[in-house]
Swiss-Prot record:
<keyword id="KW-0963">Cytoplasm</keyword>
<keyword id="KW-0966">Cell projection</keyword>
<dbReference type="GO" id="GO:0030032">
    <property type="term" value="P:lamellipodium assembly"/>
</dbReference>
<feature type="domain" description="Calponin-homology (CH) 2">
    <location>
        <begin position="254"/>
        <end position="361"/>
    </location>
</feature>
<dbReference type="GO" id="GO:0030027">
    <property type="term" value="C:lamellipodium"/>
</dbReference>
<keyword id="KW-0677">Repeat</keyword>
<feature type="modified residue" description="Phosphoserine">
    <location>
        <position position="7"/>
    </location>
</feature>
<comment type="function">
    <text>Adapter protein that plays a role in integrin signaling via ILK and in activation of the GTPases CDC42 and RAC1 by guanine exchange factors, such as ARHGEF6. Is involved in the reorganization of the actin cytoskeleton and formation of lamellipodia. Plays a role in cell adhesion, cell spreading, establishment or maintenance of cell polarity, and cell migration.</text>
</comment>
<dbReference type="InterPro" id="IPR028433">
    <property type="entry name" value="Parvin"/>
</dbReference>
<keyword id="KW-0472">Membrane</keyword>
<dbReference type="GO" id="GO:0030031">
    <property type="term" value="P:cell projection assembly"/>
</dbReference>
<dbReference type="GO" id="GO:0005737">
    <property type="term" value="C:cytoplasm"/>
</dbReference>
<dbReference type="GO" id="GO:0034446">
    <property type="term" value="P:substrate adhesion-dependent cell spreading"/>
</dbReference>
<feature type="region of interest" description="Disordered">
    <location>
        <begin position="1"/>
        <end position="57"/>
    </location>
</feature>
<keyword id="KW-0965">Cell junction</keyword>
<dbReference type="InterPro" id="IPR036872">
    <property type="entry name" value="CH_dom_sf"/>
</dbReference>
<dbReference type="GO" id="GO:0071963">
    <property type="term" value="P:establishment or maintenance of cell polarity regulating cell shape"/>
</dbReference>
Amino acid sequence: MSSAPRSPTPRPRRMKKDESFLGKLGGTLARKRRAREVSDLQEEGKNAINSPMSPALVDVHPEDTQLEENEERTMIDPTSKEDPKFKELVKVLLDWINDVLVEERIIVKQLEEDLYDGQVLQKLLEKLAGCKLNVAEVTQSEIGQKQKLQTVLEAVHDLLRPRGWALRWSVDSIHGKNLVAILHLLVSLAMHFRAPIRLPEHVTVQVVVVRKREGLLHSSHISEELTTTTEMMMGRFERDAFDTLFDHAPDKLSVVKKSLITFVNKHLNKLNLEVTELETQFADGVYLVLLMGLLEDYFVPLHHFYLTPESFDQKVHNVSFAFELMLDGGLKKPKARPEDVVNLDLKSTLRVLYNLFTKYKNVE
């Protein structure tokens, strides 16, 4: 026997019941929200009193918030990563590493992801310094990777410390994929080994420093200078008589310039060429190539260099070719970089010409 069907609950009644429930729920949520806002306001006030100089915490990646008490982590502010100069610096360094390691069939795509374990840094240093490091070839464990990094960085420090470089990286920062530390290391290596690259000057980034104190995350911003001028970066590990002339004896510098102009014109006049401005007229490399041919008494085939260079790369090619001719002539490797000469750096140009003067001053 089937039971009689229950009559449906009247619609208006259910609406009143729902509205009553939602009203109570809304009131409860509102009270909780007000209580939470008061609590947050009190906490904000307490933090403002305890750390008045601490800015509000910026958005950070979830993995960057997994910190122990009093632990600190740094990261580049996202806006700095979009800066054209920063992007150029990263690209130039990536291209340089891949050029150096082309025979190793190593391709680096992302600095922090490909360099943190020490494997690529080991190969890079061995190639640049012409040495062999006593480390395991492949290490998967964190301990093994840090041991390799320790060996590689100690070798780097032995090279850079006598030059006066400030070492702004560590095993933990490199292994922790700290891009700022990795960039500092690569810039130092590039300058020390005179990499044939042109680093963008005055690259500065905003770094977010996150610290955990009393269970709360606190952040602050600092400016980190990655590059200055090429001259200043080179000067960190190389000072010579020309530095002294530029800094302390401008009157003697004028005499040196006149002597070098007299020297180069003595030979370039044979081709009906004359120099009046050292920094500008040697910047494209043409006069340097022709001068080497005159000093060594040979004709330089025109297809070996650009007689009327137009681009920066063509000018760098010419100066680099002139440097090769100097090495073939028994001269030491020039202290200047081809890029510096092309960029109208007078001190670099004077170094190159003075190197020629000391050997060929008695050549007629």
